[in-house]
Amino acid sequence: TYSRASQARMTNSSGVIVSVGSGVPRLGHHVWNGSAWVNEGLLHESEARTNLVPHSEDFSTTTNFWGPLTTSTIAIQPTVTDPTGTNNAYLYTPQNGGIGHQQNYENVSIPSGNTYTLSAYFKKPSSNALNHAVLAFSNNSGYGAVAVFNLSTISVDTTGTHPTAAAVLDANITDAGNGWYRCSYTINHMAGMWVVHVGGSTVPGYGAYSRNTAGDGTSGILIFGAQCEAGNTPSSYIPTAGSAATRAAEILTVAAAKVPNAGTKTPIEVSGTEMLTNPGFDTDTD
């Protein structure tokens, strides 16, 4: 039997992130392989995850949920399709010169002593595009941990952290299809940070610990779907609209009588790739 006590997201055959109802297995989850959407079978996450970013999609200067933009601008792009198939992508444009990462930030609850992964979706606009995506944790005054990603070479440019703020564990960029890339940055939070930043840069790293980025006043980057979660990997997208939100753990229960006996030499085969944070069956009951 299968159970999950919440909605969850998966990617369909068109490359659109869609919602799946509570208790419904995420069958037919697709992954972009660089040229086509491939059916990976069942997307199964046996660990609950919480997106700690209160507003994962609303970067508007009207609502001001995200921090002030004193040296950059941001605007929704009604003609751009975001990864969920809607039009909630924003264009972030840093002004000319060095930009502190106190731009486009939101407060999150990330107690020290834990591992956190920050992720977001980025895309280069059709013109005047920034090549570099930026993710950062900080205290909003230059004390932080930053990762910069190259959207042209599809690689991690650089990571940096204040030596007492965090330890860098990992950084990755994944092709999410339709020109979008999901970038993620994992740290061990040591002390003193409580905001996350999502942005872009004209250069792969600027200033001590890569804590600053740079703009030219005209080039921008499309952003969508900010997510910060406890854990050492990014999980499936969890949208938020005012407060943190949780995707429940998925549980597979296999009756012992239905598990093949080793003496029969009948293998248990998994078709497709499961996204497992805790591999293996959660429950084995009679």
Protein language model regions, located:
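Glycine- and acidic residue-enriched flexible segments with recurrent GG/GxG motifs
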Residues: 1-286
